[in-house]
Amino acid sequence: MWNLLHETDSAVATARRPRWLCAGALVLAGGFFLLGFLFGWFIKSSNEATNITPKHNMKAFLDELKAENIKKFLYNFTQIPHLAGTEQNFQLAKQIQSQWKEFGLDSVELAHYDVLLSYPNKTHPNYISIINEDGNEIFNTSLFEPPPPGYENVSDIVPPFSAFSPQGMPEGDLVYVNYARTEDFFKLERDMKINCSGKIVIARYGKVFRGNKVKNAQLAGAKGVILYSDPADYFAPGVKSYPDGWNLPGGGVQRGNILNLNGAGDPLTPGYPANEYAYRRGIAEAVGLPSIPVHPIGYYDAQKLLEKMGGSAPPDSSWRGSLKVPYNVGPGFTGNFSTQKVKMHIHSTNEVTRIYNVIGTLRGAVEPDRYVILGGHRDSWVFGGIDPQSGAAVVHEIVRSFGTLKKEGWRPRRTILFASWDAEEFGLLGSTEWAEENSRLLQERGVAYINADSSIEGNYTLRVDCTPLMYSLVHNLTKELKSPDEGFEGKSLYESWTKKSPSPEFSGMPRISKLGSGNDFEVFFQRLGIASGRARYTKNWETNKFSGYPLYHSVYETYELVEKFYDPMFKYHLTVAQVRGGMVFELANSIVLPFDCRDYAVVLRKYADKIYSISMKHPQEMKTYSVSFDSLFSAVKNFTEIASKFSERLQDFDKSNPIVLRMMNDQLMFLERAFIDPLGLPDRPFYRHVIYAPSSHNKYAGESFPGIYDALFDIESKVDPSKAWGEVKRQIYVAAFTVQAAAETLSEVA
């Protein structure tokens, strides 16, 4: 109960006042003394920081990274499956925790959450069948992939399935929908007048995220989706199938989740951590779950379905794959097969299951309340030779190198957090739940997040996706690293990267792509506004048109795949470790944060020009509805001028003054945060970055000014054009306001 001050107490209180005033004066004097002491200590610490982070420490860190260690770690991580929510993956978490402690981190903890996961039914397998007019099954798809050599006796290999597919046994005519993209369904419905309602559709993997394919099929009225990997997309010419090469065998199948979470995290606890006391929605109210059964198959089985297709011919060559079938669209089978139907048998279950992140801490010596995070996931669909363990092995070696320096008496200026995420494959759940639980700390203290999923998807050149704030950091770092590429001996990584993957916009510079989603940086960048980036080695996208790498998410993604075909010397893994680790080192140790806001100004102008050109495909409507981009271009101009002035001040200020140093660094750190709209994008409240978001039509791809882009998309087909163009105007306003507000955060503090 509160103790109230009564009238009879007032005299006593008055009598005590002089003594309290004296005490207050003493406290105030002591406070000034303490402030002076801390100011002096901070100056001393700041000066000492220049001594604990000389350039030779960066060299020592990079020199400590060893390819043979990464190779050893990868082998260790890939001998058994590590499916999220399983005992095997929990044991791997404990192993990593123990080893990170041995490496020398200050603390390593397990952070657990209880999230919704999905598994096949062990006694009722999933499959697709063709049935005759009597309902008898005359063809069934395979129940599992033939195991790769050497793995025949490995247990607990999850059979191919589409995670979070609802149960169901729909049957009906089949319709071939190409990649099941938005434009593919437009072609079917608007041009070919083919109705997918009540049909089962078959789509090939590639081009867009599988969850977008399923969403598009649902919107078209389909009652089931079959996914398959066409050789045109997953079989490179001139290369043999595994185990004799790195191509996908006919019985190989890509697993994956089919959610449409849009950044929500655990479907039952959107926006909040899935801890012990969490409120959980019922399954009917869960976020992002598909409503129709979905199942993946290999191209041998797909051929059995597609070879019987009747109906319309494919509209053009872009609808034809590499199977020896006509690629007819349907609906239904042809000729003597016209009475046959396709039936799905899906019995998977969704279960709330405990997952475990591993969080390691290396405390900063000067700014321990500023966090630089390196994170990558640990869970895999099967062995995870590339995804994710090629990344997990690199993180392990980076931690070991940092730990070695720490044992020699070194510490970073800022705190470094290392994360081994769980359940990434089930919708980025481990990283999202941890970020939700720590969102208040991260919003105040998060400097940067570097993602460390697969280290390779090819062996041709470097690939980087990051915020514009990191462009200069990446350029400067790669100029100091040696290229591992043949023909570039003695050259820098920057030189080989620029030669092999030149920027389409900026002459003499390498290509850097926008951040989309499909990986654990999503919550940090798209929701919290923490500057983020990722790097890996990739293929030649100009000549190798197939999707990603052929054995993605199949049982054949083994250690041997990497060691025999992709990186026998592990030199590309080492280079990726140097890039990822070097970025973390610079972000954690630079006196002034290595962010350049001028690069943001450049891309903002480019993005504004691009979205304006898209809008000008509708000049009459722009005029009719008085749509103007003047406010956005004005805001970009102001941002450019203020960013330039800020950069000038950044060169001239007294770096020995810890208060001014902290203030300037905070302006850099919080700039990314300034692009966050707390209300989020329309119908996607957890995507809050106004400049970048995953495409609404392909989660993997990034879109600039996404609010405006989505408002303009297919606007000519909107029922109410006045309302549609009103939304365009609103999104221009939101973008202009946000850019202007972000610019003001860089203004000189009064």
Swiss-Prot record:
Protein name in UniProt: Glutamate carboxypeptidase 2
Cofactor dependence: Zn(2+)
Gene3D superfamilies named in the record: 3.50.30.30, Transferrin receptor-like, dimerisation domain, Zn peptidases
Mutation effect (residue 387 to N): No effect on enzyme activity
Effect of residue 424 to A: Complete loss of activity
Protein induction: In the prostate, up-regulated in response to androgen deprivation.
Name of the gene encoding the protein in the UniProt record: FOLH1
Effect of residue 424 to D: Reduces enzyme activity
